[in-house]
């Protein structure tokens, strides 16, 4: 039973012609549905709650349905969310249940003498690149009355539609000339319509695990949230990584009874290097089950003793040519051009191979997500798109010495007075390019989605490896389940095929990444002083944002790279107005510095 459209108009409750309400002519149909469901499911052990319906407001007819369930079965509770809108019928439900309630609102209920257990019958609208902030909900498990919720929903709903060339694409509302339409609004699954897995499952898998792991340098704390099972079916693997490379692994077996938590000492075997060190404990299955093979990883915990590169340019003689339009830096097997006219890096040749297709430009915005559009961010943050696309260089500062070349471009941003961004390129005798972009915060401006540089290299550079948080895309509010490590993938694979193309493929906390061709020619990007975020995709931000379907993204003649100081989270409380939580925003009032080094692989 659902009659949403009869009592809610444009998102507002207006029940003047609510159905079924307390109308006697609807009561037989309501009771018939209740009886049919009861007779069908009464002997299924997996059915533990009777629900009177979904989004149908409240009234005597639904109250009579609840009375019917209780009269025929006194062993199962009755659920109905609609009383949220109509509290005089609160007695219908045994469970406090709300649609898309914010974590703070749920916590307020749980901390104010709750009379009923709480379940979010729908929450975390995972439309497109979504699922950010899920941990804010699962953290509520500390309250005994909180019984979790149901992510909306499991799978994208889309239909294959033929194209004139004989291929097919996953279509959504409006693609069949249907009007009115909610367009891609049914693309809200944690599984794609073709039953392949979305990157959103990375976060869900980790946070929904009944085994929680916290690690430090000498111990592991394990919480067993299972109701009946101990941990005898699992092995725990204690590993140490140095700069992302595994140096040791040992096996442990821990006895933690259901519902209990315990801390155990762990002998992590470390190396002698002065590298960044990752202490990790992973929980894996001892034997195969019907749903997973032997050795399947359930969850893992990490502790990182952080150490980011502080590399600086090496002083040695350079061959520099300063012309009217370019500054050329030449050395053994490399030549680099910094342009006075284009106001950026325009050429980087190593071993005769040109890498730069389009030089770095300022970037403040992303290809907006479904949640971004629902929250009104494209309007709120539109000025930053203009600022990135049309910034003007008002000053070029050139420092040329025998052993050093440094060029700084000072950008003025249209629409934002007294806001400057400085981008500096420094080249050393090895041909390494040290890049720094500085934004000095200013109060009173709208926030921006991200800050960094976007540029293009040759399309042949498609092999991607990185040392950062993976294996799927990771964002500030989607870090649970993303583990720091070294990953091998490709430019094609790192882009997630959401129903409507949007921001995708970001990797948070990256220390370094390489992009190469099949002959091992390529570039390495290393974070300096602080980890960055990056993506390497087949299309630019603008191309992705302008496409409505995946097939509209034509094969690009370049590999597009973004290196970012910061990017805001993707949100997920809902897709029709909920903003990204404050702690996951990028504030324009704060200062940001992006610093990294570019060098050839060979």
Q: Where on the chain are the PLM-derived regions?
A:
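Flexible loop/turn segments at secondary-structure boundaries
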Residues: 7, 56-60, 86-89, 104-105, ...
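Beta-strand-rich binding/interaction modules
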Residues: 219-252, 263-267, 274-285
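Extended substrate-binding grooves/exosites of carbohydrate-active enzymes
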Residues: 1-217, 226-232, 237-245
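Short beta-strand elements of extracellular/lumenal beta-sandwich folds
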Residues: 217-226, 434-441
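Short proline/glycine- and polar residue-rich coil/turn motifs
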Residues: 254-262, 585-588
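Polar, glycine-rich mid-to-C-terminal structural blocks
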Residues: 281-309
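Beta-strand/loop-rich accessory regions of lumenal/periplasmic or secreted enzymes
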Residues: 269-275, 289, 303-602
């Amino acid at each position: 039973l659902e009659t949403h459209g009869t009592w809610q108009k444009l998102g507002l409750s207006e029940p003047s012609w609510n159905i079924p309400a307390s109308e006697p002519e609807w009561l037989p149909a309501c009771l018939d549905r209740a009886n049919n469901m009861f007779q069908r499911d009464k002997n299924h052990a997996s059915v533990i709650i009777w629900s009177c319906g979904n989004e149908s407001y409240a009234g005597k007819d639904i109250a009579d349905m609840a009375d019917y369930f209780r009269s025929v079965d006194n062993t199962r509770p009755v659920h109905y969310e609609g009383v949220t809108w109509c509290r005089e019928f609160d007695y219908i439900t045994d469970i406090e249940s709300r649609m898309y309630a914010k974590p703070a609102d749920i916590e307020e209920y749980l901390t104010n003498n709750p009379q009923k257990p709480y379940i979010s019958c729908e929450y975390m609208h995972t439309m497109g690149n979504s699922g950010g902030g899920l941990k804010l909900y699962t953290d509520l498990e500390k309250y005994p009355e909180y019984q979790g919720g149901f992510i909306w929903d499991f799978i994208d709903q889309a239909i294959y539609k033929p194209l004139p060339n004989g291929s097919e694409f996953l279509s959504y509302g409006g693609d069949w000339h249907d009007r009115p339409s909610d367009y891609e609004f049914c693309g809200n699954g944690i599984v794609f319509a073709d039953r392949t897995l979305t990157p959103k499952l990375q976060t869900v898998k980790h946070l929904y695990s009944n085994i929680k792991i916290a690690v430090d340098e000498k111990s592991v704390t394990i919480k067993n949230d299972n109701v009946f099972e101990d941990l005898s079916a699992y092995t725990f693997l204690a590993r140490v990584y140095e700069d992302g490379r595994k140096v040791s692994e040992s096996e442990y077996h821990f006895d933690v009874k259901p519902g209990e938590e315990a801390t155990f000492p762990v002998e992590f075997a470390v190396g002698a290097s002065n590298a960044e060190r990752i202490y990790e404990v992973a929980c894996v299955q001892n034997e195969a089950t019907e749903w997973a093979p032997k050795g399947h990883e359930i969850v893992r915990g990490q502790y990182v003793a952080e150490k980011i590169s502080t590399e600086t340019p090496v002083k040695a003689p350079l061959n520099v040519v300063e012309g009217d339009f370019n500054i050329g830096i030449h050395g053994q097997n490399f030549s680099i051009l910094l342009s006075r006219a284009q106001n950026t890096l325009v050429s980087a040749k190593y071993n005769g191979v040109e890498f730069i297709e389009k030089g770095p430009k300022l970037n403040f915005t992303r290809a907006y997500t479904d949640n971004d559009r629902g929250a009104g961010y494209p309007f709120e943050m539109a000025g930053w798109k203009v600022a990135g696309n049309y910034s003007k260089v008002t000053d070029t500062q050139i420092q040329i010495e025998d052993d050093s070349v440094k060029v700084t471009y000072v950008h003025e941003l249209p629409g934002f007075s007294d806001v400057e961004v400085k981008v500096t390129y420094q080249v050393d005798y090895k041909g390494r390019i040290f890049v720094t972009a500085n934004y000095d915060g200013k109060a009173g401006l709208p926030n921006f989605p991200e800050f960094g540089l976007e540029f293009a290299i040759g399309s042949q550079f498609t092999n991607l490896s990185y040392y950062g948080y993976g294996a799927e895309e990771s964002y500030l509010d989607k870090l649970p389940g993303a583990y720091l490590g070294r990953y091998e993938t490709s430019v094609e694979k790192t882009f997630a095929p959401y129903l409507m193309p949007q921001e995708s493929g970001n990797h948070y906390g990256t220390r370094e990444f390489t992009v190469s061709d099949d002959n091992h020619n390529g570039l390495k990007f290393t974070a300096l002083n602080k980890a960055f975020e990056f993506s390497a995709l087949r299309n630019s931000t603008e191309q992705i944002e302008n496409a409505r379907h995946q097939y509209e993204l034509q094969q690009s003649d370049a590999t597009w790279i973004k290196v970012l100081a910061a990017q805001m989270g993707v949100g997920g409380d809902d897709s029709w107005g909920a903003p990204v939580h404050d702690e996951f925003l990028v504030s324009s009032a704060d200062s940001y510095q992006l610093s990294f080094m570019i060098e050839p692989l060979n």
